[in-house]
């Protein structure tokens, strides 16, 4: 049975990967046919499928990181994730649906730090070769206002 401790450890590793700028590893947290979306609470409540960020495969996530490294121009910054404990809604030995509250601080190259996003991850986990992977992650942001500088994944 997939449990909260496994999911909390997974989320900690996920956050560390993003926060330490090991972005090339980020897509490996997902299945090949994953779904990743960043949306806001109002759009999610209304069932609107479009998101601020939307990807439907691990390859799309890899392309996003390639663009981040090679093509996009943005002000240098980094994130620090603060995560709550996960809550499992359903699950068995190989799959689980869970939600986890998050807050992401953005630290600019100048040292200025601000709350960038807060909300909850709505996740569908599966196991592949005994390791947890995200089949789906929807990052539902509390605010309907999104900074245009969402270069890094939440």
Curated annotation (Swiss-Prot):
Optimum pH is 7. About 20% of maximum TPADO activity is observed at pH 9, whereas no activity is observed at pH 5. Its EC number is 1.14.12.15. SUPFAM superfamilies: NTF2-like. Pfam families: SnoaL_4 (PF13577). Inhibited by EDTA. GO terms for molecular function: iron ion binding; terephthalate 1,2-dioxygenase activity. Heterotetramer composed of 2 alpha (TphA2I and TphA2II) and 2 beta (TphA3I and TphA3II) subunits. Part of a multicomponent enzyme system composed of a reductase (TphA1I or TphA1II) and a two-subunit oxygenase component (TphA2I or TphA2II and TphA3I or TphA3II). Component of the terephthalate 1,2-dioxygenase multicomponent enzyme system which catalyzes the dioxygenation of terephthalate (TER/TPA) to 1,2-dihydroxy-3,5-cyclohexadiene-1,4-dicarboxylic acid (DCD). It can also use 2,5-dicarboxypyridine (PDC) and 1,4-napthalenedicarboxylic acid (NDC) as substrates, and preferentially uses NADPH which is the physiological electron donor. Belongs to the bacterial ring-hydroxylating dioxygenase beta subunit family. This is Terephthalate 1,2-dioxygenase, terminal oxygenase component subunit beta 1. The gene is tphA3I.
């Amino acid at each position: 049975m997939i449990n909260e401790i496994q999911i909390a450890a997974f989320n900690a590793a996920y956050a560390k990967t993003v926060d330490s700028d090991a972005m090339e590893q980020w897509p490996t947290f997902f299945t090949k046919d994953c779904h990743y979306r960043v949306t806001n609470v109002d759009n999610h409540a209304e069932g609107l499928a479009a998101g601020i960020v939307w990807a439907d495969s691990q390859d799309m996530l890899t392309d996003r990181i390639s663009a981040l490294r090679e093509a996009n121009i943005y002000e240098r910054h980094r994130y620090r994730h603060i995560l709550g404990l996960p809550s499992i809604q359903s699950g068995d030995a190989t799959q689980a649906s869970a939600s986890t509250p998050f807050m992401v601080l953005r630290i600019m190259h100048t040292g200025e730090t601000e709350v960038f996003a807060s909300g909850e991850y709505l996740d569908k986990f599966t196991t592949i070769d005994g390791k947890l992977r995200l089949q789906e992650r929807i990052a539902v942001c509390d605010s309907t206002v999104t900074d245009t500088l969402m270069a890094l994944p939440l």
